[in-house]
Design a protein with these regions (language model features):
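Short glycine/serine- and small hydrophobic-enriched flexible loop segments
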Residues: 89-92, 277, 719-723, 768-772, ...
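Stable alpha-helical structural segments in soluble proteins, enriched in small hydrophobic residues
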Residues: 87, 144, 178, 599-607, ...
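DPxDG-like acidic metal-binding loop motif
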Residues: 121, 125-126, 754-776
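Surface beta-strand/loop "capping" patches
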Residues: 348-374
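Glycine- and acidic-rich phosphate- and metal-coordinating loops
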Residues: 726-750
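Short pre-catalytic strand/loop immediately N-terminal to key active-site residues, enriched for Gly-Thr
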Residues: 750-754, 932-935
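C-terminal nucleotide
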Residues: 491-733, 776, 785-797, 803-937, ...
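Unchanged
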Residues: 2-347, 379-386, 390-392, 396-542
Length: 980
């Protein structure tokens, strides 16, 4: 198929989807007044009605259309012509006329003998290897509804008749329907294809001259139906009848007596053979009488053909040759397998693919709404639909599985294995060869002699052979089917088989429980979606990909249970992603937020576990060694790699950060005091906030998740250091051992939300002060671990760079390999005196006058990482390289090159979190752009401090004057800072 040809059909496909969407949502868009499906019997009709009801309930079908499913009357096989007349009677009963009515009639009442796995559900609702844009897997019915959505706008009234086993690809804009008569929609196909179908031969007026049904290549050539390219005008099964033709045709059955004469199993009229033939301009009545019927030559058929000829002969059938167009016939099982495995590549331009609604671990087989568990072996060219393969099962090459669970079995090659639940609750699994023709008497390519007489009547075909045992469970029925195969191969348990109640392909489909089939498909589809969801997570997929899986239906309670079971068995990194992505997919709901919280709870538990492995709670079992102690620490500025130190990224990937300790106004801004109290209580004070609290109940000290609690940091430090337990205990027992306790924190001259690491450094100062108070011997690593635990207990989610930056003087390059227990390597960067002087002269902090709560921002950034946002993953990796390069340039004294890296980092920071900047920050940088060489935020950004590197020769006073001129008295100002 040529590229331009494919592009045209693809665009037509996309246009059809847009027409379909308009038919659902626009009241002025022309739609079918009636969509009628024909069915072979009431059971099949009920199955069709259920399928339609499901789609209507989900608003997937045009609401203005009247839907009807009409089984052959009285359960008799009346042929497609009889079914058409039955449809006409239905519409006329409803409307009284055909004028002004647009009717779509899809003939879908066959037994599907050539593809028996679709006998029960009907080939019309058999799967197509395509996932629709709304996330649903497609069926032939869905393709008809979508593909024909544009046709009503092309016709005034009348009926479009389609064959339910042929998928047509064309552009409705090419349809030019006649006002009266009929029109046959035809595509060009190779003569080798045409010989197995109907072929039209055009007369001089552009009408159908002859209708040649399943003729040889020689016959088609001799009748002039083959063009120079070896192509024929194939009968696609799509025919338009005008309203006046329908009215005349209806006169044949407008009374009960007439209806009974034409719609019965003796006449068994064919729509294509008996209604189209008289419309061909060169046909004759004598030839018409001799045309091969769907059933048998009978007197009733002869009489009906005479009447049909008289009614239709005055009309002609225009031949509508559409191109580019394509005709896809869902014929035999062998053809179906070939189409689903190798054939899909020819239709990739239609988004057809081997794996639809499933997870394929290999490209050597195809599946549709199926699951294959680890340890199973699926050989080449298999096709699995609505099936579950587990327990190290082996599926032989070329085999087709349908509606079956196979556990631990070895299924032979080139067979079909199809299970049905029957209306009495029992099961039958039918096995036959992919190449078998059920209309014939062969089985698995050989005779059926091994089974003896397995027929009730004279039809000794596989279709009627009662060889399939009925069992109490699907698993037992699979075993029984494999025994049938073994018997055909000359082995097997004959006694078990002969003593069992058995059914045929025919009788089993007529006894099928259609509701159970639909329930099975839906149940499996839910499980498959879970597998796809988990696969997206495990394969570093994104939230958008995860949401696409559930776009057509909300996550059910059953699916949530499956996901939670998988999460329970997963490692912590997978588990947190599962919960986070599940919460995001569920949207802004209470349940969704609960799952997101569980994701961060997993991170918190992981960090606490890592800290515990390093030995947190060091103050436990210690007595105070001092009456009072005080700790003062500097702040830090982050230059490179910030965010890579944040759990869970650092635990999973490792982290690299470059930062420096600073003083503000020449002072150490962070201060913590701890002292003994005579009373049995804990007193906490946040001096800079003017808050003081007295605690005598331990549970009040264990509540650490409120970011607005002025004592949340104090409480978390007491828990992390082991002064009080995280849960349980009595405060009176603790104070009896260590006495009363006073802990006070204070930040000197630092605005809230500064971005200078105040919270984490304050946590580190609390830990350091408690260690000193209790006389705990410790290393710097102990301080870092405990401070990080404080962060996690508060649910801030912060990393380790702030503690290192504030507790250790100078410029540091800090690295940590991946691992739940973070082992920090701190390398002090030795700078020349000239470089230090230049940095202190050019490096400047600017306060924005704004603040941003880091807790919410951390959730966003961490969420983007664990949901595998591609730009976030890239930036988190790249900023670590920049941190190392910054250290390299500063060690060489290349401050200008450091400034360039600072700018590059700023762009990457915005990729990690777009909220790190805003209009005000952008305006500040714009106002001083000519004065600075480098720019960066402090901490998370979005407020607090900005850091800049002045151009050579520019003074801090010049910068301050520019800011004051631009922003007046709104709080934007240069702050005095010193690198130490």
């Amino acid at each position: 198929m040529g590229n331009s040809y494919s592009l045209f059909l693809r665009q037509s496909y996309l246009d059809a989807w847009e027409d379909y969407r308009r038919s659902l949502h626009r009241a002025d868009f022309p739609v079918w007044d009636y969509i009628i499906l024909t069915a072979s019997n009431e059971a099949q009709a009920n199955a069709y009605r259920q399928q339609i009801a499901i789609r209507r309930a989900k608003n997937l079908l045009p609401a203005r259309t009247h839907y009807a499913v009409l089984p052959d009357p009285d359960g008799l096989r009346v042929g497609s012509g009889g079914a058409t007349l039955n449809a006409l009677r239905y519409v006329c009963t409803q409307e009284g006329t055909f004028a002004g009515k647009r009717i779509l009639c899809i003939h879908s009442g066959g037994d599907s003998k050539r593809v028996p796995q679709y006998s029960a559900c009907g080939k019309l609702f058999s799967p197509v290897p395509r996932e629709l844009p709304n996330g649903r897997r497609s069926t032939l019915f869905d393709e008809f509804i979508i593909g024909m959505s544009g046709v009503p706008s092309r016709i005034r009234d009348g009926m479009l008749v389609l064959s339910g086993d042929v998928l047509l690809l064309f552009n409705p804009l090419q349809i030019d329907a006649p006002a009266s008569g009929a029109a046959a929609i035809s595509f060009k196909e190779d003569v080798e294809t045409g010989k197995n179908h109907g072929v039209f031969q055009m007369d001089e007026q552009g009408n159908v001259g002859e209708f040649l049904h399943k003729q040889t290549v020689e016959m088609l050539t001799s009748r002039g139906a083959v063009n120079a390219q070896g192509k024929v005008d194939i009968d696609t099964g799509a025919v338009l009848f005008s309203a006046d033709l329908l009215a005349d045709l209806y006169t044949l059955v407008d009374t009960p007596a007439k209806f009974a004469a034409f719609v019965n199993d003796r006449a068994r009229l064919s729509f294509y053979g008996d209604f189209l033939y008289p419309l061909a301009s060169r046909s004759t009545l004598e030839q018409f009488y001799s045309e091969k019927p769907d059933g048998s030559f009978t007197e009733e058929l002869h009489a009906c053909r005479t009447a049909v000829w008289q009614v239709l002969r005055k009309y002609r059938m225009r031949l509508l040759r559409l191109a580019p167009a394509s005709f896809i016939h869902f014929g035999t099982t062998h053809e179906l397998r070939a189409l689903m495995t190798d054939g899909v590549s020819a239709y990739s331009f239609l988004d057809w693919k081997k794996c639809v609604s499933g997870c394929c671990s290999s490209a050597n087989y195809a599946l549709n709404n199926a699951m294959v568990e680890e340890g199973c072996c699926i050989h080449d060219d298999c096709y699995l639909e609505d099936s579950h393969v587990m327990g190290s099962a082996i599926i032989g090459s070329g085999t087709v599985l349908s509606h079956v669970t196979v556990s631990g079995k070895n299924i032979p090659a080139n067979v079909v294995l199809h299970s049905l639940k029957l209306t009495d609750g029992r099961f039958v699994t039918r096995i036959y060869g992919v190449a078998d023709n059920p209309k014939e008497g062969t089985f698995l390519g050989g005779s059926m002699a091994a089974f003896g007489n397995v027929w009730d009547g004279g039809d000794h075909s596989l279709w009627q052979a009662k060889i399939y045992p009925v069992c109490d469970s699907m698993a037992k029925s699979v075993d029984a089917a494999l025994n049938v195969y073994a018997l055909a191969m000359g082995t097997g348990d004959y006694d078990a088989w002969v003593s069992a109640e058995r059914v045929s392909l025919c009788s089993s489909f007529n006894s099928a429980d259609m509701a159970a089939i639909l329930e099975w498909e839906m149940h499996l589809r839910k499980a498959v979606k879970v597998e796809r969801f988990l696969s997206v997570i495990c394969c570093s997929g994104t939230i958008e990909e995860a949401k696409e899986i559930f776009q057509d239906a909300a996550i059910s309670a059953y699916q949530r249970r499956l996901i939670e079971d998988k999460a329970a068995a997963a490692d912590v990194f997978t588990r947190m992603r599962i919960f986070y992505c599940l919460g995001k997919v569920m949207g802004d709901s209470q349940e969704g937020e609960a799952y997101i919280k569980r994701a961060f709870d997993e991170i918190q538990r992981m960090v606490l576990a890592g800290a515990a492995a390093h030995g947190t709670g060091l103050c436990a079992h210690h007595q105070p060694v001092e009456e009072e102690t005080a700790v003062r620490l500097p702040l830090r500025v982050n230059w490179g790699g910030g965010w890579s130190d944040t759990p869970p990224y650092c635990n999973e990937k490792g982290g690299t950060v470059l930062n420096a300790a600073i003083l503000l106004g020449g002072e150490y801004p962070v201060e913590v005091h701890v002292r003994r109290l005579p009373k049995p209580m804990v007193v906490l004070e946040s001096a800079d906030m003017g808050a003081r609290g007295e605690f005598t109940v331990i549970s009040d000290l264990q509540e650490c998740h409120n970011p607005y609690d002025p004592f949340v940091l104090h409480k978390a430090a007491l828990i992390a250091c082991g002064v009080i337990p995280r849960e349980g205990g009595e405060l009176t027992d603790i104070t009896a051992k260590i006495g009363g306790l006073y802990v006070s924190t204070q930040m000197h001259g630092v605005p809230k939300g500064s971005g200078l690491g105040t919270s984490s450094i304050l946590a580190g100062a609390c830990v350091k002060a408690l260690f000193q108070y209790f006389g705990v011997a410790h290393t710097e690593d102990d301080l870092y671990e405990h401070a990080m635990c404080v962060e996690q207990i508060m649910s801030t989610g912060g990393g380790w760079q702030d503690q290192v930056g504030g507790m250790t003087p100078g410029l540091k390059l800090i690295t940590a390999p991946a691992g739940i227990q973070q082992k920090l390597n701190v390398r002090h960067i030795a700078l020349s005196e000239d470089t230090k002087a230049e940095l202190n002269a050019r490096f400047t902090l600017i306060y924005t006058g704004q603040r941003r709560l880091a807790r919410n921002l951390l959730r966003d950034v961490v969420g983007r990482y664990i949901s595998n946002a591609p730009d976030s993953l890239y930036a988190l990796e790249e900023i670590q390289r920049i941190a190392v390069m910054m250290a390299f340039e500063l060690e060489r004294g290349h401050v200008d090159d450091f400034a360039k890296l600072l700018n590059r980092h700023w762009e990457l920071s915005k990729m990690i979190d777009a909220g790190s900047t805003n209009t005000c920050i952008d305006q500040i940088f714009l106002a001083i752009d000519d004065l600075i060489d480098g720019r960066m935020i402090c901490g998370a950004g979005g407020g607090g401090f900005l850091q800049v590197l002045l151009k050579r020769g520019v003074t801090k006073k010049q910068l301050n004057d520019r800011l004051h001129d631009t922003f007046q008295d709104c709080g934007v100002d240069v702050w005095d800072c010193t690198l130490i």
